[in-house]
Every structure is written in structure tokens, then in C-alpha cells.
A protein has these predicted regions:
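Class I S-adenosyl-L-methionine-dependent methyltransferase catalytic core
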Residues: 1-132
Length: 132
């Protein structure tokens, strides 16, 4: 049986952006707890497919819901560690300016944040794990 040499997980950030109408899509979860549960299943599939000793990367940010930060990155990190992944490093990636690269303006996101009562995050995490 062939195994993967490297695993990259870059899940949607809870329900911030809907990517499809499929019920299996993590962006369509009805709650943050459901998102965490389904993410854990995806991570388990990846763990099983990854060759022993190889690495995985989780790229994720946080969300803001009900007037508080939802620490998606750290919650998903904990689920990966519970599967047996060993955390090797955390990189905090500056994402300021990404909206301009996508043809959007920073003012649009600032307006949406003020109108919608949410916080604009300017970072995301790149977490590196190893399967032992």
C-alpha cells in the first residue's frame, strides 16, 4: 500500500466563507463543534495515509463569532495531536495585503468588519507536525 510523503491541511475557517452546498463540506457545518469533529475525521484520514516519520502542515486562522475569538488553529492543533501527530513548530504568517492580491481592497473588509461586528485577523498559523 502506497503512503503519502507530505500532508497539507488547509481547511475552511469554520463558516466564514461557504465553498459549496455539499453537506460534507466543512464550511457548511451547523456549529463550531461539528466543524471540529469533522476536521478530526479529515485529519485521521490524513494520518492513516501518511508514511511514518513524514510531516504534515496545518494552515489555518481563527474566527470571530458571538463577540469572541474562536481559536480554530489551536483547537485543530489539539485534535491532530490527539491522533498521534507530534507538533514540531508553529509559524505565525502575516496575511496583511492578501486581500489586495485577490483583487479586493482592505477598506472593503474593514467596512464589513465594522458593519458585521467582527474582528479582522491579520495572521494565520502554519503548524508543522510529524507522524512517529
Amino acid at each position: 500500500e502506497e503512503k503519502a510523503q507530505f500532508l497539507i491541511l488547509h481547511p475552511p475557517y469554520d463558516d466564514i466563507i461557504k465553498f459549496s452546498d455539499k453537506k460534507e463540506d466543512l464550511s457548511n457545518c451547523s456549529s463550531t463543534d461539528e466543524f471540529y469533529d469533522l476536521f478530526a475525521k479529515v485529519a485521521k484520514n490524513g494520518y492513516d495515509m501518511l508514511e511514518k516519520g513524514r510531516f504534515a502542515a496545518l494552515i489555518i486562522g481563527d474566527s470571530y463569532k458571538n463577540s469572541e475569538v474562536q481559536p480554530l488553529g489551536f483547537e485543530c492543533m489539539a485534535r491532530m495531536m490527539a491522533l498521534g501527530f507530534k507538533l514540531k513548530g508553529i509559524i505565525v504568517k502575516d496575511i496583511q495585503g492578501n486581500e489586495r492580491a485577490k483583487g479586493k481592497t482592505a477598506n472593503l473588509w474593514r467596512y464589513r468588519a465594522l458593519a458585521g461586528g467582527f474582528f479582522i485577523f491579520k495572521h494565520e498559523y502554519v503548524m508543522i507536525f510529524q507522524k512517529n
